[in-house]
């Protein structure tokens, strides 16, 4: 599993609730552009879009995480959202410390 995928799981875990697609996209954008780690060497690229930044790769990988049973599709406040499918396993713990701290700062 890539560090950026682990980071998505970690942010959903930190939220402790279903996270809308828009929220997760904005958190990932902030992580990439406003933190010292910048999300890591191969984090998501973003394009300007209707509601702010958008990443095709982020949505593709989130769909992969749903297919592999890490996330599940749901609704939050009437909007499409992702929620944790099960407890995030130990592989998320292998995420670099700087990235983990930056992700926690963005979600809070």
Could you tell me what each predicted segment is?
Residues 1-108:
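Domain-edge interaction signal
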């Amino acid at each position: 599993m890539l560090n950026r995928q682990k980071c998505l799981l970690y942010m959903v875990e930190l939220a402790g609730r279903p996270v809308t697609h828009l929220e997760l996209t904005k958190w990932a954008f902030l992580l990439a552009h406003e933190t010292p780690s910048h999300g890591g060497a191969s984090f998501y690229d973003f394009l300007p879009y209707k509601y702010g930044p958008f990443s095709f790769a982020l949505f593709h990988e989130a769909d992969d995480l749903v297919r592999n049973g890490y996330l599940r599709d749901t609704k939050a406040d009437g909007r499409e959202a992702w929620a944790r499918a099960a407890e995030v396993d130990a592989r998320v713990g292998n995420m670099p410390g700087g990235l983990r701290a930056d992700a926690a700062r963005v979600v809070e």
